[in-house]
A protein has these predicted regions:
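Extended, charged amphipathic alpha-helical segments
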Residues: 254-395
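Structured, mid-chain assembly/scaffold modules that mediate subunit interfaces
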Residues: 94, 98-260
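Short coil/turn segments at secondary-structure boundaries
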Residues: 154, 178-179, 297-303, 384-388, ...
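Charge-rich, acidic-biased intrinsically disordered regions
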Residues: 154-160, 176-194, 314-329, 421-457, ...
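Activation/maturation switch segments at domain boundaries
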Residues: 2-4, 18-27, 33, 350-352, ...
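Extended, helix-rich architectural segments
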Residues: 1-167, 183
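Surface-exposed loop-to-helix/strand elements on domain peripheries
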Residues: 129, 340-463, 502
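A broad, structural surface signal
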Residues: 133-144, 161-169, 173-176, 180, ...
């Protein structure tokens, strides 16, 4: 009996006989026929073509059925991270995807604008603005110092870049809240960034319901603790072995001790996250190999490629493998240097050949791959390859589409990293008495009101600033936007700071003789004691008195 053909619901197909079907048919043809009819009926009853197994195009599709998010993700993370990092280091298109997203989501860093809810706190708008200025001074003093990093290597802006870039490359990254008092510093709050590889199950035990990917869970599935290795497993000089440290997810007050920075959660119960390049790793690697082959062919075409025909036998018999120093004297196929003159042995003749490069199909093929990579990384093709050769409307639409993705990513980054760190800094400042915030530690609603903030990132990409300015002016006249929002979105600045600066510049322009030293200038060297006597610390940041 051959495969049984079916025709049902307007579709036709073929049910292939497996080994068991053939065995049943061999011993009992009638039972085998009935078995095939039942299988055909089941295949015809399938509601979705994509779920059918009788089609040749779907027979070898080995998709996991009934597997959890961790089962589908955790076993592949190690190799996905390694390949993503290798591509980012060596592949121009992968590097462009990571750098373009980082430049537009992080850029030169986010600027915070404290915004307390003065109506809930029952204070005046002027009092709220004064408090916000104090909080901003303390934040800037902390964020602009490299002491905010436990390794004392990066400022907060640089930490932002590191955290976001690591998230894209590794899928997730972790920030541990630390406390270290250092001489000359107002606050002891600092953070430690830990790479994704170092979070793993102690002694590499298998995943279970209570621990997976280095994260320990409670009975509700919420993180209870994180297990960090003290080093990477393959570090050189790792004589003493790897030691794991258990860090509680929350402290006694319910504050998160570890910030898990990752992309959008795509499935329930998802523990760890795949790198951004995961969907396009194969396409990027194949494109890289093809590009290398075409480049080598172009180099060969540009040189004088020769083949030496010897009367002693077949050419291939004289070929030997090249060593690290290049072709040896016994090689029979060589690329000559420009203008080189060479001698032939008796009986040898030279046959030249050309590989026919450049290939006219190279650019269209690379462009098609770039579009595929852009779709897989949520980047328009134009931004990925840094070329805007389409029409004005198409280029503008590409920027608008990219801006939607950047806004989403930026909001996630701010909520996962910037806001929690800002809240830590302000909380310590209040606890030390540097800021006065009644009810902060006793009323959760008042605490939330004191910690309100807005974050401004890189400006929105544009290709026609004049049209955008005209549109903003009309939106402002309609009352559907604000100057604060326009300043933040178009220029990445705080409108209130811009307004104050304009007022000062206008005053100087109206009365040039009254020009004075800018408020932004730091105290001159040697005047630290005088400045502290005036209510400023040694870095020139005002220490607001607390009554």
């Amino acid at each position: 009996m051959s495969d049984l053909k079916i025709n049902g619901r307007g579709r036709s197909g073929q049910v292939p006989m497996n080994l068991l079907d053939r065995a049943v048919t061999w011993f009992h043809p009638q039972a085998g026929l009935e078995r095939m009819r039942k299988r055909a009926a089941l295949a015809a009853a399938s509601g979705y073509v994509g779920a059918r197994s009788d089609r040749t195009s779907l027979q070898r599709w080995a998709a996991s059925v009934g597997a959890s998010a961790d089962t589908d993700t955790l076993p592949d993370l190690e190799i996905l991270r390694a390949r993503s990092r290798d591509l980012e280091r060596n592949d121009p298109m992968a590097h462009s995807a990571i750098s373009t997203k980082t430049a537009n989501v992080i850029g030169s860093g986010h600027v915070v604008r404290p915004e307390v809810d003065f109506s809930r706190l029952r204070i005046s708008a002027d009092e709220a603005e004064a408090w916000e200025g104090q909080a901003l001074d303390i934040w800037n003093n902390w964020a602009e110092s490299r002491d905010c990093d436990v390794t004392r290597a990066q400022t907060f802006v640089e930490l932002e870049d590191l955290v976001y870039r690591s998230r894209l490359l590794s899928g997730d990254v972790f920030v541990i809240r630390r406390y270290k008092e250092r001489p000359g510093r107002l606050l002891g709050t600092c953070v430690q960034v830990v790479e994704a590889d170092r979070l793993s199950n102690p002694n590499w035990v298998s995943d279970s319901d209570r621990m997976a990917g280095g994260i320990e869970f409670d009975q509700d599935g919420a993180p209870a603790a994180y297990h960090f290795a003290d080093r990477h497993a393959v570090d050189r000089g790792n004589i003493g072995g790897v030691v794991w440290r258990r860090v509680p997810a929350f402290d006694d007050t319910g504050r998160r001790m570890v910030l898990h920075i990752h992309g959008p959660r795509k499935r329930p119960d998802m523990t760890r996250y795949a790198p951004m390049l995961a969907p396009v790793i194969e396409a990027l690697k194949q494109r890289s190999r093809y590009s290398e082959a075409e480049l080598m062919a172009a180099v060969v075409s540009a040189c004088f490629a020769i083949g030496m025909a010897s009367p002693d036998g077949d050419l291939s018999e004289g070929l030997i493998q090249q060593n690290k120093e290049g072709a040896t004297a016994d090689s029979q196929i060589v690329l000559t240097d420009p203008g080189q003159i060479f001698d032939l042995l008796p009986g040898e003749e030279v046959k030249s050949f050309a590989p026919g490069r450049p290939n006219p199909q190279f650019a269209p093929f690379i462009d098609a791959i770039a579009r595929e990579v852009g779709a897989g990384t949520d980047l328009p093709h134009e931004m990925l390859v840094k070329q805007f050769q389409a029409s004005y409307s198409a280029s503008r639409a590409a920027l608008e589409m990219a801006w939607q993705f950047f806004k989403t990513d930026r909001a996630l980054h701010v909520s996962q990293f910037c806001e929690p760190v800002y809240e830590d800094v302000i909380t310590e400042a209040i606890a030390r008495g540097l800021l006065k915030a009644p009810g902060f530690f006793t009323d959760p609603l008042r605490k939330q009101a004191w910690l309100g903030s807005t974050w401004m990132g890189p400006s929105r990409p544009t290709i026609d600033p004049v049209k955008d300015a005209n549109a903003d002016e009309k939106y402002l006249a309609m009352g559907v936007t604000t100057r604060t929002r326009i300043a933040a979105e178009r220029f990445g600045v705080d409108y209130r700071a811009v307004r104050r600066r304009i007022e000062r510049e206008s005053a100087v322009a109206d009365n040039p003789q009254s020009s004075s030293v800018s408020e932004d200038v730091s105290p001159r060297p040697g005047a630290a004691d005088q400045e502290r006597g005036k209510g400023r610390n040694r870095r020139g940041v005002k220490l607001w008195p607390v009554s």
